[in-house]
């Protein structure tokens, strides 16, 4: 730990990483506060900040020669086979770490690798290469399985803990496995933090973008007060301010053969309203809609739009154009709505729900990986990051209000490399609720723009559904005809 006065150059360097957002750190009294320029307080500067050679410092950091927490179960013959780009990442990491050791810098590296790159297997290779006892920290238990699979493939002795940290501490008194796979809430326990700081050298923070380290969280406190000897942040969408805690980044672009298409399924709707909708519209401009809660609630009860989504999905799935579908909503009630309606169409052998409130959901996710055809309905919170179903070939985004980081993570669910190359995303920019019409259009356009500009998708207009089902409740032509007749009649009165 380094308690330092906030001199101008140090403040400027730290503030630059927050991209204009408030800079918050622990002060000498242990309070997590916003740092003001010229402050007389001393602040705890994160160890990982000094990982970059561009940060000037006279501080000298420990190297791996000062510890003896080595893996005992390692077998070099079990090292996973890597693709050329993955081997390039390993080479870059090893080269950077040599330089860090020579200059006595902290061994902290952010692996900024695209969704579908294979961060888990690459990191397991690095873990085996280092041969140091490791803690793998995940934001939720849904990510445990993919780590368990890869750690077992490498042949490392491991322990998984997702529930009580107290019972884990008791077990650690008699055995100390080479690899601990835990959920991040374990870091709220100071005794556990002290234990892993002493007995484990490598700390892997998976999906690091899910943590805002400018907030006083368990992960923030751990990295500040119990900094590990070595640390990897893994992410496809780095959070800029988190660089203060891990200030060395390796980013290798991944070329892909995937054929990625995003369809904007547009339609003309007559205005739709109910008492419930009118009640929620009144809240759109109030403080209760600060995070667009009511915007998404309105979408969840937009019957014509929901019907368009269902019609499109049912027709595409029946035609065999798409086979392994992820349907994403923002709200749980919206998820349940689509699940029930799709269940009526296709039955429980095809339609599954990714419900955070169901403890059996992770087991269900494992089981559907082997299916050739399925529809998985879930929420952005539960399945938007880290969902491990590599075979997904299509994504229906039913919500609209999604930030750029969430968009990139969500689209990454269908960008995993498999033998099948076609990937399709469907977005729905239209709404029958006129008060949010332009807002929804703008939000959905942001999804389209990011997918095209950054992730290599090609945008195409979607007309198949409207042309193939002229009797549908969502048909464009019939609605346009009625409105045009109405306008014509009004002009000739």
From Swiss-Prot:
Main location: virion
Subcellular location: Virion
Gene3D superfamilies: P-loop containing nucleotide triphosphate hydrolases
Enzyme class: hydrolase
Subunit structure as annotated in this protein's UniProt entry: Interacts with G2. Might be part of a transcription complex composed at least of G2, A18, and H5.
Record motif DESH box, residues: 206-209
Protein name: Transcript termination protein A18
Any Pfam family hit: ResIII
InterPro entries: Helicase/UvrB_N, Helicase_ATP-bd, Helicase_Restrict-Modif_Enz, P-loop_NTPase
Domain of life: Viruses
E.C. number(s) listed in UniProt: 3.6.4.-
Annotated residues for binding of ATP: 113-120
Helicase ATP-binding domain span: 100-256
Family classification: Belongs to the helicase family. Poxviruses subfamily.
Purpose: DNA helicase which seems to act as a postreplicative transcription termination factor. Involved in ATP-dependent release of nascent RNA. Forms a stable complex with single-stranded DNA, and to a lesser extent RNA.
